[in-house]
């Protein structure tokens, strides 16, 4: 199965862009998709809802949640979660940054360093 890492702004609201990007990835993979995300509001939530919806429709799509533990790790929880998601591996990273999007841009950099292709659907830096 193709692994797709999602990272995006917490204020991302454009469902169509996220859904279309994921649908394109599903068409590339006859064996299905694993949608890796951090469970944040915005782009992550939109991707998660798409994954569950496609799964209910009978497609081989599995959401894979990597939630940040803010209570245990404090301010570095997002960074640690991003590193965990990248280390879990992905065939591609779909990014949906808006404005500064510090955590999103961090995840994009980590994915690039790991050799994961990053496709930016949001604001350019």
Curated annotation (Swiss-Prot):
SUPFAM superfamilies: MCP/YpsA-like. The lineage of its organism: Viruses, Duplodnaviria, Heunggongvirae, Uroviricota, Caudoviricetes. It comes from Mycobacterium phage D29 (Mycobacteriophage D29). It comes from the Viruses. This is Gene 61 protein. The gene is 61.
